[in-house]
Swiss-Prot record:
Protein's name according to its UniProt entry: Aspartate-semialdehyde dehydrogenase
Gene name tied to this protein: asd
Active site: C130 (acyl-thioester intermediate), H243 (proton acceptor)
EC class name: oxidoreductase
EC number: 1.2.1.11
UniProt keyword list: Amino-acid biosynthesis, Diaminopimelate biosynthesis, Lysine biosynthesis, Methionine biosynthesis, NADP, Oxidoreductase, Threonine biosynthesis
Classification via InterPro entries: Asp_semialdehyde_DH, Asp_semialdehyde_DH_beta, NAD(P)-bd_dom_sf, Semialdehyde_DH_NAD-bd, Semialdhyde_DH_dimer_dom
Native source species: Synechocystis sp. (strain ATCC 27184 / PCC 6803 / Kazusa)
Transmembrane segments: none
Binding-site positions, NADP(+): T13, G14, A15, V16, R41, S42, S160, G161, Q316
Length: 338
């Protein structure tokens, strides 16, 4: 059994931070010490962990002393601010933000896809974007059998992707609309209840938003396949938690549907959900709180002989963020890569 290590959660009070806390407990992660770090306004408060109330500390230059591992989920600016302090303290940072994902020397890791990449870290390992992780876990089993040439993906992203306050905003907007009031938007740019809109991340020079470009660039890096052609359209939808994606794949030659179903059903981190007679396939409601990515509606693309279509749903706070980070941490401990 691996030796227990000293862990800090940076951003412990956020949606991903609290999920990290739950996962470390439920997966019996080998902890020698657990330190909860957040902004000064949360300092002095407590969070429960395995029956104990742990104090939250304000992050400062000495906060990482003695830590072996830091699970960072406080946003890109915070990760950049403290990365040097963390690595100087001798700890490894598993970072959930986008700050370091495309830095060439920083591994971008999904344990079901490229676990060996974690071995080459220089003190920082990046956790991919939620939509990238969910799609990657679902389609990598097919890529292993026959390299994917092109991916066309449309996402249906829940409010929780914008944080806990966005979820509350959608609830309030729903009540307002049902009571005949005009819904107000403060966290998201527009009312999301009974509505949807293209993802609200900044638009880039090529007219794709940043969220869409993350899917393109990160998938290529994780798959170590710069030649995959990828296009994405990301949409925010009025669902509280769990993202969904419609994915079209193109291969060099026809890919048998039954082979695809078998490969996905056997793959780690994925669950095949299909009942064609009942028209029952993955739904965000079913994926919420689940570790596995739910995949279904696998079918031949009638517009292309070498194409497949599939539908997936996954909890972006768990596998799309916190669970993937904990799995990376487990990998580092089990293989002695800290």
């Amino acid at each position: 059994m691996p030796s227990p290590i000293r862990v800090a959660i940076l951003g412990a009070t956020g949606a991903v931070g609290t999920e990290l806390l739950e996962l470390l407990a439920s997966r019996n992660f080998p902890l020698a010490e657990l330190k909860l770090l957040a902004s000064p306004r949360s300092a002095g408060k407590t969070l429960e962990f395995q029956g104990e109330k742990l104090p939250i500390q304000a992050v400062d230059g000495s906060a990482f002393k003695g830590c072996d591992l830091v699970l960072a989920s406080a946003g890109g600016s915070t990760s950049k601010r403290w990365a040097e302090e963390i690595t100087k303290a001798g700890a490894v940072m598993v970072d959930n933000s986008s700050a370091f994902r495309m830095v060439p020397e920083v591994p971008l890791v999904v344990p079901e896809i490229n676990p060996e990449a974690a071995q080459n870290h220089q003190g920082i390992i990046a956790n991919p974007n939620c939509t990238t992780i969910l799609m990657g876990v679902a389609i990598y089993p097919l890529h292993q059998l026959q390299p994917i040439k092109r991916i066309v993906v449309a996402t249906y992203q829940s409010a929780s992707g914008a944080g806990a306050m966005a979820m509350e905003e959608v609830k309030h907007q729903s009540r307002d609309i049902l009571e005949g009031k005009i819904p107000q938007a403060e966290i998201l740019p527009y009312p999301l209840a009974f509505n949807l809109f293209p993802h609200n991340s900044p638009i880039t020079a090529n007219h794709y938003c940043e969220e869409e470009m993350k899917m393109v660039q990160e998938t290529r890096k994780i798959f170590a396949a710069e030649d995959i052609r990828i296009t994405a359209t990301c949409v925010r939808v009025p669902v509280l938690r769990a993202h969904s994606e419609a994915v079209n794949l193109e291969f060099a030659t026809p890919f048998p549907v039954e082979l695809a179903k078998t490969a996905i059903a056997k793959a780690p981190g994925v669950k095949l959900v299909e009942d064609w007679q009942k028209n029952y396939f993955p739904m965000p409601m079913d994926a919420t709180g689940q570790d596995d990515v739910l995949v279904g509606r696998i079918r031949q693309d009638i517009s292309h002989p070498n194409g497949l279509d599939l539908w997936l749903c996954g909890d972006q706070i768990r596998k799309g963020a916190a669970l993937n980070a904990v799995q990376i941490a487990e990998l580092l401990v089990e293989r002695g890569w800290l």
